[in-house]
């Protein structure tokens, strides 16, 4: 069973939508940033400060290679995962890419008080617009995109469910049996 991979800019709701979608589909949920934090033993913000963005992106790429195999997961990715074409190819090999988007002002309202966003320093509103401009078109790799600023969480999940059903991504009797996140294979760096 293919993974359902949520992509989009920070603050578009990937984790919230992913968690809800996983519960409805009775599939394991994996947040790539949380998994990288678990493996590194420190928060993303500290990885960026102490080890640099290059190290974080390297860990992210390694995780994407592990996700190239369909495992029936719902995966919330970090906002910059699509900047590496190899990540996109690996994620697409194992699943269907669903995009989440929102207006810059909606994103600002969602992330402005969060201290855990390493790419948001200084004028947060301006930085969001700058990053969105830099990433213009990067999220177009999604097969289907929902504007989470225009829809409630339940409506967003419902629209994704409709798309998955229409495209045949939801197979009868393919729900996760264990309910936990399957062990990802160890891939040599």
Swiss-Prot record:
Protein name (record): Shikimate kinase
* Its job: Catalyzes the specific phosphorylation of the 3-hydroxyl group of shikimic acid using ATP as a cosubstrate.
**Highest taxon, organism lineage:** Bacteria
Q: Which residues bind ATP?
A: 11-16, 117
Listed pathway(s): Metabolic intermediate biosynthesis; chorismate biosynthesis; chorismate from D-erythrose 4-phosphate and phosphoenolpyruvate: step 5/7
Major subcellular location class: cytoplasm
Q: Which CDD domains match?
A: SK (cd00464)
Q: Which residues cross the membrane?
A: none
Q: Which organism is it from?
A: Desulforudis audaxviator (strain MP104C)
Q: Where in the cell is it found?
A: Cytoplasm
Q: Which Pfam family, an example, fits this chain? A: SKI
